[in-house]
């Protein structure tokens, strides 16, 4: 009895949504073109970081080789982007990674993904709103901050902000009102601001190549000494590297690439438009790939121009572009850069706010969050309640809280979503070409089929069928789960025991070699299984290699987070599990459908019994 109850409970946690190939019906308005999705992706990804990040990384980590950092970071990010693109072509819904997890690995993982996406978008919105407020305040001489500091102070360091940011509050509420007007209106504003941002960045890149000097990529120690002697008469070269194009060596490039990786986060907002894109199976993959390519060109071009205009060690880490234009004698250009920065912050803010209610709506429609969040406006066809609720929460966060310590928490949610999407692509590529059934139906079907199919060594490495079967699909499912565990263990070892590995400690080197051997062997089993041949507008190439590399990169970056960040993540997940086990698991649409099916079955049984009784009595 207890075993059956536990079995039913476990089945609830892994029950999956039906995989619907095609667009299907939606209550939202299909009004977004491919251009709208590209603008949304570029605007969300190409935020204020392009105006700040290049200076910080070039000065302290990579020097002129920052261009290679952005190339490495782009290649790492594009792995996750390709996985999102395939799912956008295969499962065009509004839930992004939440929906992809639900149709592949089950309800509990889907809730975990969606819950963390909500946190990421809320923190992202609030932090960008405060950055917008700070940038505007800086333009007008810091009058806003000085006035508020002199009248209202919040004396709770590391929890509340130094002062309440009324400007950030008003900005988030204003953009919430814009989102309420409909997806087409917000898409138009995004296109305008993204276009202005790209024009400013084009001016920066062209100006940099005109005014730049190639000698700034070939600096020597003599140049460093000359600079130091002009400043204070000393020659401390430790912080400047060893000269040349790669002054900090390969290690500097890798450290810089890890920082630059976060510059490409944001494209996943395109995946939340599956129910509003006119042709999602084509537009979502194209939008993701094109937007990532544009962002790479922008980052690559700006970092090249910046390091050509002035020596990297003279860059100002907080405002590199204005300082670079002052260095080459183009002082008025700093105002154009300021306008571009505000446009970038505006599109980044919209890019964080747009997907937030879509994820809430998708989860509420499935019953995992409160159903009221799934209410859609009859005129604008947007999730009205989810939009208002998410906007108010983000505005409140921007108004009161110090968000510096929460940015890493936002990164965990994003990286977890990227990892799960990569795993889901790996699993779904090898599943039979059929709609996913409920857990109970699938288990019955599998038991019948597996009686005919037996797991042998030949089935692992030389399967007979050229198309996926239930057995080959289950093999890939188990192997993918094992690979996820092994990759996590590998990342833990590489993070916590770096020193003994570098020194060649035979114990830890053996451990790493064994883990890599197991990963290669299990990957070989997956590689030998037949793939699903359903035609899609886009498919990830080199499966299973690329999804596995994507998982490794994302998990490794997650392991770099501090213990405090993981503690906050644990608290957030406890709140989420309280909602899921207290509400979602009972109100899930899968649960409701099961309860609706049972009475019908019982009614048919009663009718049959009554009919039989009547026959006997006659």
UniProtKB/Swiss-Prot annotation:
- PTM details? N-glycosylated.
Q: Carbohydrate attachment sites?
A: 232
Report the residues modified as Phosphothreonine: 605
Q: Which Pfam families match?
A: AA_permease_2, AA_permease_C
Catalytic reaction equation(s)? L-arginine(in) = L-arginine(out); L-lysine(in) = L-lysine(out); L-ornithine(in) = L-ornithine(out)
Q: Does the keyword Transport apply?
A: yes
Q: In which tissues is it expressed?
A: Expressed in adult brain and in a wide variety of embryonic tissues.
Q: Which UniProt key words apply to this protein?
A: Amino-acid transport, Cell membrane, Glycoprotein, Membrane, Phosphoprotein, Transmembrane, Transmembrane helix, Transport
Q: What's one GO MF term for it?
A: L-ornithine transmembrane transporter activity
Primary residence: membrane
What residues form the membrane-spanning segments? 37-57, 62-82, 108-128, 163-183, 192-212, 245-265, 286-306, 336-356, 381-401, 407-427, 475-495, 507-527, 540-560, 569-589
Spell out which residues lie on the membrane's Extracellular side: 58-61, 129-162, 213-244, 307-335, 402-406, 496-506, 561-568
One BP term from GO: L-ornithine import across plasma membrane
Gene Ontology CC annotation, any one = plasma membrane
Top-level taxon of origin = Eukaryota
What family does the database annotate? Belongs to the amino acid-polyamine-organocation (APC) superfamily. Cationic amino acid transporter (CAT) (TC 2.A.3.3) family.
The family database entries (NCBIfam families) matched by this protein are listed as: 2A0303 (TIGR00906)
Q: What is the name attached to this protein's record?
A: Cationic amino acid transporter 3
Species per Swiss-Prot/TrEMBL record: Mus musculus (Mouse)
Q: Which gene encodes it?
A: Slc7a3
């Amino acid at each position: 009895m207890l075993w059956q109850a536990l079995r039913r409970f476990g089945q609830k946690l892994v029950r999956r949504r039906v995989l619907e190939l095609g667009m299907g019906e939606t209550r939202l308005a299909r009004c977004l073109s491919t251009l709208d999705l590209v603008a949304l992706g570029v605007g969300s990804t190409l935020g204020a970081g392009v105006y700040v990040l290049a200076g910080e990384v070039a000065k302290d980590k990579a020097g002129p080789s920052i261009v290679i950092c952005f190339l490495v970071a782009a290649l790492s990010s594009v792995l996750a982007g390709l996985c999102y693109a395939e799912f956008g072509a295969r499962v065009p819904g509004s839930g992004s990674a939440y929906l992809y997890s639900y149709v592949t690995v089950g309800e509990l993982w889907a809730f975990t993904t969606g819950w963390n996406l909500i946190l990421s978008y809320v923190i992202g919105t609030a932090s960008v709103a405060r950055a917008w407020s700070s940038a505007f305040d800086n333009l007008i001489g810091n009058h806003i901050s000085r006035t508020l500091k002199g009248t209202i102070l919040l004396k709770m360091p590391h929890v509340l902000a130094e002062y309440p940011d009324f400007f950030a509050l008003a900005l988030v509420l204003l953009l919430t009102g814009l989102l309420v007007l409909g997806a087409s209106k917000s898409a138009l504003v995004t296109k305008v601001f993204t276009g202005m941002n790209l024009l400013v960045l084009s001016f920066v890149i062209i100006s940099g190549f005109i005014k730049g000097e190639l000698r700034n990529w070939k600096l020597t120690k003599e140049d460093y000494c000359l600079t130091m002697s002009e400043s204070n008469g000393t020659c401390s070269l430790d912080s400047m590297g060893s000269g040349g194009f790669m002054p900090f060596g390969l290690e500097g490039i890798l450290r810089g690439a890890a920082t630059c990786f976060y510059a490409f986060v944001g494209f996943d907002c395109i995946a939340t438009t599956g129910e509003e894109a006119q042709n999602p199976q084509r537009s979502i993959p194209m939008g993701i790939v094109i937007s990532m390519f544009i962002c790479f060109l922008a980052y690559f071009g700006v970092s090249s121009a910046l390091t050509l205009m002035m020596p990297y060690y003279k860059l100002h880490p907080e405002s590199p572009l204005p300082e670079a234009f002052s260095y080459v004698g183009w002082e008025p250009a700093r105002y154009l850069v300021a306008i571009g920065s505000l446009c970038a912050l505006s599109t980044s803010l919209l890019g964080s706010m747009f997907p937030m209610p879509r994820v809430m709506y998708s989860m509420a429609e499935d019953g995992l969050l409160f159903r009221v969040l799934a209410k859609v406006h009859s005129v604008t066809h947007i999730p009205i309640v989810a939009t208002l609720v998410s906007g108010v929460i983000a505005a409140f966060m921007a108004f009161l809280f110090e968000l510096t310590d929460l940015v890493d928490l936002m990164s965990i949610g994003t990286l977890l979503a990227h990892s799960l999407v990569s795993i889901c692509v790996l699993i779904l590529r090898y599943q039979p070409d059929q709609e996913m059934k409920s857990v109970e139906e699938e288990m019955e079907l599998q038991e019948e089929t597996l009686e005919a199919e037996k797991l042998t060594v030949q089935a692992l490495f030389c399967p007979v069928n050229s198309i996926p079967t239930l057995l080959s699909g289950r093999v890939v499912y188990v192997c993918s789960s094992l690979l996820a565990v092994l990759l996590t263990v590998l990342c833990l070892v590489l993070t916590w025991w770096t020193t003994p590995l570098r020194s060649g400690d035979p114990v830890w080197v053996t451990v790493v070699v064994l883990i890599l051997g197991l990963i290669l062997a299990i990957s070989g089993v997956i590689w030998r299984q037949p793939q699903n041949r359903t035609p899609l507008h886009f498919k990830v190439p080199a499966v299973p290699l690329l999804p596995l590399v994507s998982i490794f990169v994302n998990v490794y970056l997650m392991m770099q987070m501090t213990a405090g960040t993981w503690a906050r993540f644990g608290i957030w997940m406890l709140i989420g599990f309280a909602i899921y086990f207290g509400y979602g698991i009972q109100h899930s649409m899968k649960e409701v459908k099961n309860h609706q099916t049972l009475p019908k079955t019982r009614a048919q049984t009663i009718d049959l019994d009554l009919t039989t009784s009547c026959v006997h009595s006659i």
